[in-house]
């Protein structure tokens, strides 16, 4: 398997002239994996952690498989965490997962495990159901709405960029990760407070 990867990365000639060990030492993205071992978590062993907005419009419960397997919240390989985050989310009937938001750097993928509802995206609201796979690239606002009669459960896979700025178009708020600081932006002169 390693030889196949090396051939894809460097071509057959590069593999014949250079040892596998020296190639591994020269390529930092491969070195990150070197010396690590498999991490494991079982979803059914994890408690559901509830997250509700003060007035109850937004509500979900989550199981963080990545955190249970040794990952760090919003921290990728650049900070000693995992390269992606994996969670299971469950939205009760009549609730919404999060305020509509768009990431500047992070990709998110959702796989609907059970239930039905709507995704609110660039085309407005569209019906979703078990078996649907949704991919949200950076810059695309999205949210899930459970307008069904049972829980809407889905798998979330997200990469872990070193920094991500999240915009909430309905309220004009911003959030910066990994610091998780939320703010409203006010226009200011570039040199204000600098001299």
Question: What does each model-found stretch correspond to?
Answer:
Residues 107, 111-117:
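Glycine- and acidic-residue-biased ligand/ion/polar-headgroup-sensing regions
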Residues 123-138:
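Short acidic-glycine-tyrosine-enriched beta hairpin
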């Amino acid at each position: 398997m390693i030889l196949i990867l090396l051939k894809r990365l460097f071509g057959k000639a590069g593999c014949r002239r250079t040892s596998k060990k020296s190639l591994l030492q020269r390529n930092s993205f491969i070195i990150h994996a070197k010396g690590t071992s498999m991490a494991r978590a079982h979803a059914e062993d994890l408690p559901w952690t509830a997250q509700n907005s003060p007035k109850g419009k937004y509500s979900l419960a989550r199981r963080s498989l990545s955190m249970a397997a040794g990952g760090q919240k919003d921290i990728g390989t650049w900070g000693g965490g995992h390269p992606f985050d994996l969670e299971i989310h469950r939205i009760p009937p009549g609730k919404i997962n999060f305020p509509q938001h768009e990431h500047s750097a992070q990709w998110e993928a959702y796989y609907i495990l059970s239930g039905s509802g709507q995704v609110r995206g660039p085309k407005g609201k569209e019906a979703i159901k078990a078996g649907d796979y949704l991919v949200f690239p950076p810059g695309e606002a999205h949210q899930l709405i459970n307008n069904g009669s049972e829980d809407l459960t889905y798998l979330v896979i997200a990469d872990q960029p070193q920094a991500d700025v999240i915009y909430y178009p309905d309220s004009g708020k911003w959030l910066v990760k990994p610091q998780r600081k939320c703010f409203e932006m006010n226009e200011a002169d570039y040199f204000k407070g600098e001299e």
